């Protein structure tokens, strides 16, 4: 029930954000949204566990539930989107027509492939981060402190910086810049694989990767929002974001095999090269947007 309600709320919030924000606000809006998501993860994860050491779980859950009052108040105070289009009245208008509208667009298949492949390199590089670091001799405490502490800070900084850069340089340029940075950042793990148990390099690798990935995520989310027809934001954004899970499915099976067969150094080189398909699809950006959102 909690998962169902949470997913439903995510769809509504994503649709509202897409409808309310102006095109030039999509980048910063995506950055702030991801910031809120990360803070929520920190609050419901680390902070909740710290509180659970000092009070009963019943009280902790009540406090977590009480924190939702902030979100409720924000929802009440949030402005309604200014839409001229009528709201859907039938299942066809709400579900079928959004799909038909999207797939009737020029380059729809290429857009979907771009969504699947744009962050393939990041997903590959991070899929085996913990086993990789354990094999190098780092303790679970070391890994947890750096990935959950520094990693989260770097991700938040990356998303906020990425959102600001999207607003300043434009969507197309940002997707190119961050796509390349994401690929290059995975090579920090290659350097760590060559150095072995080297704590400063481990900190640097995780920090750099999370920073660049955060910037890429901000531009990626802003681009998805820009693709939505404002008459069908909820359905279309749900369709586009659901494809992000396909990337993890693609990566899930071969990662362990590649690392075991070819070794960590080759694996991270392959991870960096995995950015190429997404960047090749990005060459068709103007075709998708008709030259808008550049």
Task: Please name every model-derived segment.
Residues 66-85, 281-286:
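C-terminal membrane-cytosol helix-exit motif in multi-pass small-molecule transporters
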Residues 27-48, 52, 241-252:
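Glycine-rich segments within core transmembrane alpha-helices of 12-TM secondary carriers
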Residues 80-112:
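Juxtamembrane intracellular "pre-TM" segments in multi-pass secondary transporters
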Residues 7-21, 215-229:
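Intracellular juxtamembrane helix-capping segments at the cytosolic ends
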Residues 106-145:
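Extracytoplasmic gate region of multi-pass secondary transporters
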Residues 180-197:
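C-terminal ends and interior cores of transmembrane alpha-helices
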Residues 157-174, 259-260:
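Helix-to-loop junctions at the C-terminal end of transmembrane segments
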Residues 18, 23-32, 140-141, 230-240:
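Loop-to-transmembrane helix entry/capping segments in MFS-fold secondary transporters
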């Amino acid at each position: 029930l909690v998962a169902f309600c949470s997913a439903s709320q995510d769809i509504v919030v994503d649709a509202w954000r897409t409808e309310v924000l102006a095109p030039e606000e999509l980048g910063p809006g995506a950055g702030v949204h991801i910031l809120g998501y990360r803070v929520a993860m920190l609050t419901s994860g680390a902070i909740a566990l710290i509180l659970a050491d000092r009070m009963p779980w019943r009280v902790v859950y009540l406090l977590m539930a009480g924190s939702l009052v902030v979100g409720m108040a924000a929802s009440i105070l949030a402005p309604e989107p200014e839409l001229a289009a009528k709201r859907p009245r039938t299942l066809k208008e709400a579900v079928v027509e959004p799909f038909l509208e999207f797939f009737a667009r020029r380059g729809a298949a290429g857009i979907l492939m771009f969504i699947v492949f744009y962050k393939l390199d990041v997903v590959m590089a991070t899929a085996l981060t913990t086993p990789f670091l354990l094999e190098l001799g780092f303790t679970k405490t070391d890994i947890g402190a750096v990935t959950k502490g520094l990693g989260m800070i770097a991700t938040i900084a990356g998303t906020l910086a990425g959102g600001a850069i999207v607003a300043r340089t434009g969507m197309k340029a940002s997707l190119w810049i961050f796509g390349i940075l994401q690929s290059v950042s995975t090579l920090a793990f290659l350097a760590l694989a060559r150095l072995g148990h080297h704590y400063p390099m481990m900190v640097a690798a995780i920090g750099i990767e999370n920073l660049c990935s955060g910037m890429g995520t901000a531009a990626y989310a802003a681009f998805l929002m820009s693709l939505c027809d404002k008459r069908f934001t909820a359905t279309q954004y749900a369709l586009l974001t659901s494809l992000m899970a396909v990337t993890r499915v693609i990566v899930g099976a071969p990662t362990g095999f590649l690392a075991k067969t070819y070794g960590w150094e080759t694996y991270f080189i392959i991870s960096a090269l995995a950015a190429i398909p997404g960047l090749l699809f990005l060459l068709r950006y103007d075709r998708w947007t008709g030259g808008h959102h550049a």
